[in-house]
Amino acid sequence: MIRMRTPSTLPFTKMHGAGNDFVVLDLRDGPDPSPELCRALADRHKGVGCDLVLGIREPRSARAVAAFDIWTADGSRSAQCGNGARCVAAWAVRAGLARGPRFALDSPSGTHEVDVLDADTFRVALAVPRFAPESIPLFGHDGEQDLYEADLGDGTRVRFAAVSMGNPHAVIEVDDTATAPVARVGRAVQASGLFLPTVNVGFARVESRDRVHLRVHEYGAGETLACGSGACAAAAVLMRRGRVDRNVSVVLPGGELRISWPDDAADVLMTGPAAFVYEGTFLHASV
């Protein structure tokens, strides 16, 4: 007699923010998903398909209505996700956890104030940008610089800015984002050893004082349609260098985010959409 193993069931919600897509799990009464399960969920052919997995947790701070943890498509953990924060905010509103127009969420990188602007638009205070190499962390460079240079080992030299938005970012200014070598250079910077354990690599073009185009090669996921923390990182770098105003639109392949940074000591504010796609049940032996 052949015994068929009955798979466990895992309810989930599929969401996206400007095309950056997520599998959202309610983990308030459950364990962390294993790296294997995260990879299975993220698989676009054999799973649900997503850039990252978001796990809803009970709040960790007194003023938060919920907390969330983040896993990339390769099963590794992440400390920050701007688009994910907006989606968790929308999830919290729908679940009845957040009842007013302003509330807070806890992420692995800290506590974030959220403003509900309409049914599917949220503003999140992401973080105060940190530029000191040791706070990113960036290795092999002594002292803080506006731009760093690195030899990527294949004859390619790049100039980049570096910043932490709760997670590490390298920002490279380019003439044309459409033709920028996002995958090749993004992977090379990630493998360079300059950032440990790794880094998100953004390729930015300034169109005007209030408009920036951006593509981002994320660690653990590759290029995504949008990266909220990457948009904040690019905007903060360009604002600090005087290239753009303190309130800009960042245009990504999947949509547009509004980024503002009132002053150097303030959190960067990110405004953008959060969308529910569908709800379902995932069947997997390792759940």
Curated annotation (Swiss-Prot):
Gene3D superfamilies: Diaminopimelate Epimerase, Chain A, domain 1. One of its GO terms (cellular component) is cytosol. It comes from the Bacteria. Optimum pH is 7.9. Pfam families: DAP_epimerase. Keywords: Antibiotic biosynthesis, Cytoplasm, Isomerase. The record marks 278 as: Important for dimerization. GO terms for biological process: antibiotic biosynthetic process; lysine biosynthetic process via diaminopimelate. Its EC number is 5.1.1.19. Monomer. Involved in the biosynthesis of the antibiotic D-cycloserine (DCS), a cyclic structural analog of D-alanine, used as an antitubercular agent. Catalyzes the stereoinversion of O-ureido-L-serine to O-ureido-D-serine. Belongs to the diaminopimelate epimerase family. NCBIfam families: DapF. This is O-ureido-serine racemase. The gene is dcsC.
